[in-house]
Structure formats: structure tokens, C-alpha cells
């Protein structure tokens, strides 16, 4: 008799739909109180992939009842002009979230621009104040992909207390904030990266593996202990048998017999990223109702006038 528990495919599309439904319900409640959450999306240049990403974000916002504003600037826009636009959006009380679509043209300092967004409107969670707050376990706007990953884990595993989690990758966008969120959820966390020794050995000790390194099929069954839960953040385009396809950082077919739950690529983490952008916009709108004067002070400090 086969007593092995059935493998659980973690459906990111279904989970994202639940998050978006929750957001839409809360947005309706805010609107009933006279508050219309609004997200401003800034796109510099005409990169086709960025245009698709922006359109998807605007569509999800509209579905949730969030007002969306698009600002499209030419690729040769001076950084001072972009900074001036951000300053205007920071000061506009009707705008609750600001997202600057990355990547930016090479002549613009990406970090300087991201730090110009006032922390209470930083729905990407990239501002240093939000990054620091997350590391301290405070309630702040959190990067969308790690927040979505945590929700997938909680929905799949329940209470994460005491679980050993290994995060593969140490990027500012996923790896580091993911580790902070797992610590906040009372996991024991190990972060491994390209310079780590004994990668496979460390990963095989983990109850939870989050792979976020951008290397196609790096992690296979040999990296995973039986019954592990795997969140695959990687999205890599490869050519295989004459066809282009998307694969994750985890070798899905190899890992499948070894794990108790795993996200597919595509259809796993990706939908949750946009869902949590909408959730962050909702949270930002709420935060700004409780700290409007604080918001004004932060906006002035973050975005001084540009002469």
C-alpha cells in the first residue's frame, strides 16, 4: 500500500485571486468611508516588457477598485524631471502608492530615484526606511514578491513556527526581505548564495526552500529532503528542443517526487507579486489616514525641491 502523502501543487493563480478578492472587499469599505485608494505607476522609456508589466498592474488595480494613474516619460528624460514628478506625487494626498517601473535608463541613478519615494507611499517596499523597519520586525510596506511567497507558505503549511527555512539568494528584492519575513514568522533561517560552501548539504536540512537566484534548474532532488516545501521564485527563459520556455530555479520534474508541496513556473509566485502590490496600495492608503502629518514631513524630507 502506498502511504506517501499526495504532493501538493501550490497554485499561485488561485492564491492571488483570493488576495485580490480580499483587497477588493477592503477597498469597497474604504470607499464607503470616502477614501479612494490610488496607485501611480511611472514608466520611463518604451521597453516592451516593462510596458506589459505596467499594463498588467493597471488592470489588476482596476479590478480591485483602485484608481490607477500612469505617467509615461521618454527614455531620454532627465533624472531631475523624474525626481520632480516623484516630489509632486509624494505631495499629492490623493495618491497613496507610487511605483517606479524598473529597470530605468542607464543615465538615471536607480537607487536615488527609489529613495526619493516617501516611505509611506513606497508600495514596492524598496525605501531604506522600509527595508530597515522590516529587518527590525516592524509593520512596514514590504517587497511584494517575498510577501506573496510568505502567504503561499502560510496557506500551504499553516503555522511556520520552528520550521527551518533555507533561502537561496541574497538579493535586496527577494532574498534578504524573504529571510526577514521568515524570521518574523518564527522560522530558523539560513541564507545561502554563490559563495556559500556545502550548498546541497545546507538545503537538504530545510523544511522550506525558497529559491531566488535566477539560475535555471539549479535545485534538483539531491538538494531537497523528503517532504520539503519549495517556493520557486526564479523565472528563466531557456531554449529546449527548439522551443523557448520558462523554467524556475528548481528542476520541477526532478524535485516533484521528493517534496510535499511546490510552486510551478509559471503560475506560482508571479501572480502573487502583483496581488501584493495591490495589497500594499491598500495598506498604504490606510497608513496615510492615521499619519497624514507624518506623511507630509517625510515627503518634504525625501524630495527636496529641484532647482
From Swiss-Prot:
Catalytic activity: (6R)-5,10-methylene-5,6,7,8-tetrahydrofolate + NADP(+) = (6R)-5,10-methenyltetrahydrofolate + NADPH; (6R)-5,10-methenyltetrahydrofolate + H2O = (6R)-10-formyltetrahydrofolate + H(+)
InterPro entries registered for this protein in UniProt: Aminoacid_DH-like_N_sf, NAD(P)-bd_dom_sf, THF_DH/CycHdrlase, THF_DH/CycHdrlase_cat_dom, THF_DH/CycHdrlase_CS, THF_DH/CycHdrlase_NAD-bd_dom
GO MF annotation terms: methenyltetrahydrofolate cyclohydrolase activity; methylenetetrahydrofolate dehydrogenase (NADP+) activity
E.C. code: 1.5.1.5, 3.5.4.9
Gene Ontology biological process terms, A to Z: L-histidine biosynthetic process; methionine biosynthetic process; purine nucleotide biosynthetic process; tetrahydrofolate interconversion
Keywords: Amino-acid biosynthesis, Histidine biosynthesis, Hydrolase, Methionine biosynthesis, Multifunctional enzyme, NADP, One-carbon metabolism, Oxidoreductase, Purine biosynthesis
Pathway(s) per entry: One-carbon metabolism; tetrahydrofolate interconversion
Gene3D superfamilies registered for this protein in UniProt: Leucine Dehydrogenase, chain A, domain 1, NAD(P)-binding Rossmann-like Domain
Amino-acid positions noted as binding NADP(+) in the UniProt annotation, renumbered to this chain: 169-171, 194, 235
GO CC list: cytosol
NADP is among the record's keywords: yes
Subunit-structure text: Homodimer.
Function: Catalyzes the oxidation of 5,10-methylenetetrahydrofolate to 5,10-methenyltetrahydrofolate and then the hydrolysis of 5,10-methenyltetrahydrofolate to 10-formyltetrahydrofolate.
Record-stated family: Belongs to the tetrahydrofolate dehydrogenase/cyclohydrolase family.
Protein name in the entry: Bifunctional protein FolD 3
Gene from which the chain derives: folD3
Amino acid at each position: 500500500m502506498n502511504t506517501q502523502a499526495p504532493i501538493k501543487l501550490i497554485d499561485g493563480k488561485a492564491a492571488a485571486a483570493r488576495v485580490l478578492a480580499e483587497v477588493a472587499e477592503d477597498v469597497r469599505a474604504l470607499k464607503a468611508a470616502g477614501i479612494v485608494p490610488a496607485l501611480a505607476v511611472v514608466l520611463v522609456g518604451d521597453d516592451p516588457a516593462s510596458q506589459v508589466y505596467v499594463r498588467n498592474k493597471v488592470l489588476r488595480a482596476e479590478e480591485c477598485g483602485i484608481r490607477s494613474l500612469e505617467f509615461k516619460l521618454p527614455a531620454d528624460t532627465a533624472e531631475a524631471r523624474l525626481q520632480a514628478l516623484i516630489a509632486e506625487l509624494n505631495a499629492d494626498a490623493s495618491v497613496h502608492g507610487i511605483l517606479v517601473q524598473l529597470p530605468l535608463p542607464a543615465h538615471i541613478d536607480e537607487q536615488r530615484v527609489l529613495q526619493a519615494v516617501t516611505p509611506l507611499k513606497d508600495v514596492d517596499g524598496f525605501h531604506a526606511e522600509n527595508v530597515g523597519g522590516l529587518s527590525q520586525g516592524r509593520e512596514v510596506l514590504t517587497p511584494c514578491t517575498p510577501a506573496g511567497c510568505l502567504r503561499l507558505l502560510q496557506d500551504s503549511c499553516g503555522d511556520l513556527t520552528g520550521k527551518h527555512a533555507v533561502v537561496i539568494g541574497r538579493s535586496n528584492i527577494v532574498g534578504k526581505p524573504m529571510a526577514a519575513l521568515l524570521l518574523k514568522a518564527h522560522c530558523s533561517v539560513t541564507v545561502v548564495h554563490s559563495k556559500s560552501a556545502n550548498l546541497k548539504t545546507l538545503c537538504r536540512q530545510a523544511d522550506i526552500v525558497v529559491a531566488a537566484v535566477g539560475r535555471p534548474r539549479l535545485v534538483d532532488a539531491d538538494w531537497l529532503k523528503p517532504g520539503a516545501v519549495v517556493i520557486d521564485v526564479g523565472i528563466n527563459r531557456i531554449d529546449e528542443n527548439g522551443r523557448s520556455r520558462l523554467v524556475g530555479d528548481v528542476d520541477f520534474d526532478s524535485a516533484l517526487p521528493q517534496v510535499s508541496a511546490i510552486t510551478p513556473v509559471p503560475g506560482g509566485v508571479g501572480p502573487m507579486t502583483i496581488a501584493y502590490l495591490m495589497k500594499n496600495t491598500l495598506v498604504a492608503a490606510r497608513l496615510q489616514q492615521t499619519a497624514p502629518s507624518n506623511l507630509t514631513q517625510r515627503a518634504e524630507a525625501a524630495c527636496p525641491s529641484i532647482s
